[in-house]
């Protein structure tokens, strides 16, 4: 199976998982990226089964609207039963690295509101230790150099992601060469740097369920 076929399979599995639990008042949180796009396309086949969605990026909002799915502001929604999103890496505890698509801050906010965070990914994303994928950090533009110096002190090698401005008007530093053995601690350390909006570690609020696309089929993993 191709990577896209694996992504399609996990996207459909996520729809199959949440659909029996949705009703006409349900609002679904939706992530950003190629795997999330497959989820949106699969979810759109059942758009009469729920009320609408909260999007984690402008790109996701446009795709949802293109399918005729109502998109709500998070501030207007009292609760989200589910948040479904992809990941760049996951460990066995379902700590994640996200933010390859630069939507990490809004993704983290929507995930924090959701009762159940479902991560959908192909098998290549499951790793023993996080950090081979560079860790994205969203930064207030004027603090970029300061934050980069602090990230070097933490053992990372930050690289400015040229030409990228987040939906919030900020910039991204991608931090290479981190061996992330304690993701909860590192997430807090980086977020404590003045000028950091947030970083792409989802460890304080990890995923609750990982649907992993493999050549043998979709596997469901809960945190070890």
UniProtKB/Swiss-Prot annotation:
Keywords: Isomerase. It comes from the Bacteria. The keyword Lipid metabolism does not apply. One of its GO terms (biological process) is D-ribose metabolic process. GO terms for molecular function: ribose-5-phosphate isomerase activity. GO terms for cellular component: cytosol. Disulfide bonds: none annotated. Substrate binds at residues 32-35, 85-88, 98-101, 125. Pathway: Carbohydrate degradation; pentose phosphate pathway; D-ribose 5-phosphate from D-ribulose 5-phosphate (non-oxidative stage): step 1/1. The keyword Transcription regulation does not apply. The active site is at 107 (proton acceptor). InterPro entries: NagB/RpiA_transferase-like, Ribose5P_isomerase_typA_subgr, Ribose5P_isomerase_type_A. It catalyses: aldehydo-D-ribose 5-phosphate = D-ribulose 5-phosphate. Gene3D superfamilies: 3.30.70.260, 3.40.50.1360. Its EC number is 5.3.1.6. Homodimer. Catalyzes the reversible conversion of ribose-5-phosphate to ribulose 5-phosphate. NCBIfam families: PRK00702.1 (NF001924), rpiA (TIGR00021). Belongs to the ribose 5-phosphate isomerase family. This is Ribose-5-phosphate isomerase A.
């Amino acid at each position: 199976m191709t990577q896209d076929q694996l992504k399609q399979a996990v996207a459909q599995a996520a729809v199959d998982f949440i659909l029996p639990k949705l009703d006409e008042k349900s609002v679904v949180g939706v992530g950003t990226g190629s795997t999330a796009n497959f989820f949106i396309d699969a979810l759109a086949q059942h758009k009469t089964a729920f009320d609408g969605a909260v999007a984690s990026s402008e790109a996701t909002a446009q795709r949802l609207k293109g399918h005729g799915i109502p998109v709500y502001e998070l501030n207007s929604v009292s609760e989200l039963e589910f948040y479904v999103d992809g990941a760049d890496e996951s460990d066995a505890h379902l700590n994640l690295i996200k933010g390859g698509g630069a939507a990490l801050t809004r993704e983290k906010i929507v995930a924090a509101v959701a009762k159940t965070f479902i991560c959908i990914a192909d098998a290549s994303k499951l790793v023993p230790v996080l950090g081979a994928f560079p860790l994205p950090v969203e930064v207030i533009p004027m603090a970029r150099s300061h934050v980069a110096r602090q990230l070097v002190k933490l053992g990372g090698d930050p690289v400015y992601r040229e030409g990228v401005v987040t939906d919030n008007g900020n910039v991204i530093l991608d931090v290479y060469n981190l061996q992330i053995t304690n993701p909860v601690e590192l997430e807090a350390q980086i977020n404590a740097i003045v000028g950091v909006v947030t970083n792409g570690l989802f460890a304080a609020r990890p995923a609750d369920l990982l649907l992993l696309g493999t050549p043998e089929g979709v596997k469901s993993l809960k945190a070890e």
